Amino acid sequence: FFAGTSEIDNTDWVISMGHFMGLLDSNWLGFPANRKMTFLRYADFNCIRNGKLVRSGFFCDLIGVMHQLGIHPLPPQTGASFIYPGPRTHDGILLAPQDPSESTKTLKLVNRMCQDLEDLNVSGDDYPPPSLLAKTWCEDMIWYGPAGIGASYTIPRYQEQHQYPFRSGLKDKVFNGHLCRL
């Protein structure tokens, strides 16, 4: 998880993501029980004001649950499917104060990436060159996409396995803005 102040409206947010695991011993949301371990990938956004939760957003990968049950509502995914790992070095929890200049530099990079992608949406170009993403992404980046898309390694494979099919296959897409930006 991580927390911080949103640059959109100066509100405080706590965010977590991961996998819930349980035994699917009963039918759930119309999905048949499989009596096996079942994993639900999620991301949870919570706005806190005066010590109370005032707004939340919860996103979960129900298509991933369906895949575990042998139900495939979408065409075959183009990327790999597996339980995505945590940080590569497994030292993602930072308990000591960090260099604010490094945080500022990282935030500027993420915001530049978001702006590049927003500009791309406005342009209508569904097949941008790899050099566009290389402005803010490392060549050996890994995309951990949801079920139906899957994971990809390297910018060219990300574009082949996710970006190009997604952009060309999803017409009339609308960006409604960010819930928060930390």
What would you call each of these model-derived segments?
Residues 1-182:
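C-terminal and inter-domain tail/linker signature
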